[in-house]
Regions:
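Short secondary-structure junction motifs
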Residues: 32, 59, 92-94
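Short His-Asn-centered micro-motif
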Residues: 38-41, 67, 99-100
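Catalytic metal-binding acidic patch
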Residues: 47-77
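Generic non-transmembrane alpha-helical segments
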Residues: 22-31, 45, 49, 83-91
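A conserved mid-domain beta-alpha-beta active-site/ligand-binding segment of alpha/beta enzyme cores
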Residues: 129-133
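Short, catalytically relevant binding-site loops at active-site mouths
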Residues: 42-44, 71, 102-105
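Helical scaffold of the NTase/Pol beta-like nucleotidyltransferase catalytic core
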Residues: 1-37, 42
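Conserved catalytic core of two-metal-ion nucleotidyltransferases
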Residues: 81-128
Length: 134
């Protein structure tokens, strides 16, 4: 398995994925508050590297979250997603963009129970289910 001991080790590993590497290289252009790459794109890349696969193998999408409590509208979230998909349209992967500040507005309808509003992206990430190896 890939030896990851520091944040720098993780970033070096993720940059071996040419798609994530480009997103990270241009992350200032994402220009969203409290924004993070999260979930399967990270786990899949690390799994791939640890098992001798190309870093991009099996990636279906890239999840990018942000936290903007000042605009909880679906329209703003959709607009950011369109902008970022256009920015990275040359990459052969789907980009999913979500405002974690608005998750509580739709969570109950989708999952059957209500949640409290998150306080930050880190607060939201702390509730993510553990990822299973591919």
């Amino acid at each position: 398995m890939v030896g990851l001991k520091t944040q720098n080790d993780l970033e070096i590993a993720l940059r071996q994925n040419k798609w994530l590497g480009e997103i990270l290289e241009r992350f200032e252009e994402v220009a969203l508050p409290d924004s993070w790459l999260v979930a399967g794109c990270i786990a899949q890349t690390i799994w791939n590297l640890g098992h001798g696969q190309p870093a991009e193998f099996g990636l279906k999408d890239v999840d990018l979250i942000y936290f903007d409590e000042l605009d909880l509208s679906f329209e703003a979230e959709a607009s950011h997603e369109r902008r970022l998909r256009a920015l990275f349209q040359h990459l052969p992967i789907k980009l999913d963009v979500k405002n974690e500040a608005r998750v509580h507005l739709w969570y109950e309808e989708r999952f059957g129970y209500a949640i409290k509003p998150y306080l930050s992206s880190a607060d939201a990430i702390a509730t993510f289910p553990p990822l299973q190896p591919p």
